[in-house]
Amino acid sequence: MKKIFSALLTVCMLLGCLSACSSKKSPSNGGSATTGAKDTIVFAQASDITSLDFHVGKNPATYDVTCNIFDTLVTWDADINVIPHLAESWEFLDEDSLQMHLRKGVLFHDGQELTAEDVKYTYDRAMNSTIVKNNFSWLESVDVVDEYTVVINTKGAYTPVLNALCNPLAGIMPKHLLEQNDEAMTTNPVGTGPYKFVERKEGEYVKLEANENYWGGTVATKYLEMRVVPEASQRSTLLETGEIDIAYDVPPSDVERLNTNEATAVLSAPSFKVFYVTINCNSGTKALNDSRVRQAIEYAIDKDALCSSVMYGYATPAASLVGLGVFGYDDSATANIYNIEKAKELLSAAGYPDGFEMSVWVQSADQTRQEACVVLQDMLSEVGITVSVEPMDGTVMDDTIVKGGDFDACSSMYYNLMGDADYVLYSNISPESTSNLSHYNNPDVMAKLLAARSLTDDAERAAVYKEISSIMAVDRPYIPLWAYQNLVGVRSGVSGFQLNPITAYRYENVANGK
């Protein structure tokens, strides 16, 4: 633990210097003229959106904003049960056909009425999108029955279809605008949601205004602003000074301080987010091509100590990519438990008794992930593995990897937007998925995953996911580290804000009474 503390102290000092420099260069992050008004709520997050069109860019920062502009056919209640939304009712015509009946009189922000044609156009477009087609791998086609009725046809029976339709990436877009200009949503997104787009300044903010014709009723606050504040500590400071009202991803080290301040509080609840290390199974570092080496890396990691030292206990050690609370989560010990001698034994068997050198790419804007990687660097040194931690811009990192650039390993976080194991497993193990950054390819695992999609018995489907997790604990293309607690800081005057494990927050019922 002394080594862990020393490693953390080093990275925190470095990050503190970077933060101070960043603050001097970016005073505009300090506030806006509207921050103090009761008719405005300002929330801050670490990253900017990649696009206002989530078929073009889908990072978490994107759907944190777009989920307030666009509506889905169905959604979740506070207990993650599927409830009506744009679709007021539905029924299964057979195992692979779901008929849905739309609400009448729902208007897009430009006054045009939502119809079944918009649903079909949106999903056809999604299936042809390089960015989100993986999220619709289960979808065969959409049929328009009449103006307010559609049939969702799946590729065979797809048990979690309703959960898939709750995904913020399944929001409905306007056919009449996209037919005229396929890039219309990138500059002026128009949905049916509680907020309308006003303005975006890239790298700084997105401003929204309440939809006065929202089908769901009166929106609680007139203006909503998303502020980009990369430094986690700066988000906490802005919350304390009242320059923002809500801060996403509060650093665990700030929780106690914010909770003792009468003007602020930190909301905490389990999430479906899992933090893990992606190992490139085709890396130019040949050692990483051997599953025994990848297992050894996990055996060398003390996940309990990692959660304690980096997350201050606001995380749970993870055994698989399927997070706590997600359907298919296996709470049995399928992970490779911390065992230094076992790690050394596996390295020796693989031909690396003295270890080897590797690099880990980590998002430069994420203080917590950088701290974690420095601790991992220290832990892996105990078995002779020399790790170079290389911070870089997250977007550059993702683009480099997706385009086939060589790398050894990178820090990764997966947001399960469906609450189902199928979502995270398909994205990360399918050879066709752009999210399969490890280049993992196991036909047996893929066959099991596809077969599980049609199982209607929950116990049978969960058993398949458990089997898949066990196989992946041996192959280990991904090394799961922890499942996150949601940590969101709020000002005392804010009411109506509710955490959810999906972490895409809606604001129609959030008021600012400060």
What spans do the regions from the language model cover?
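N-terminal lobe/hinge region of extracytoplasmic solute-binding protein
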Residues: 44-94, 124, 190, 489
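Ligand-site clamp/hinge motif
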Residues: 212-257
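Long beta-strand-rich cores associated with HINT superfamily self-processing modules
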Residues: 488-514
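Alpha-helical secondary-structure segments
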Residues: 116-122, 147-151, 193-194, 221-223, ...
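Extracytoplasmic/peripheral linker and loop segments enriched in polar/acidic and small residues
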Residues: 388-397, 423-491, 514
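Gly/Pro-rich hinge or "lid" segments in bacterial periplasmic/extracellular proteins
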Residues: 77-81, 167-219, 223, 345
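Structural transition elements
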Residues: 316-349, 366-369
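Surface-exposed binding/hinge segments that line
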Residues: 91, 95, 134-177
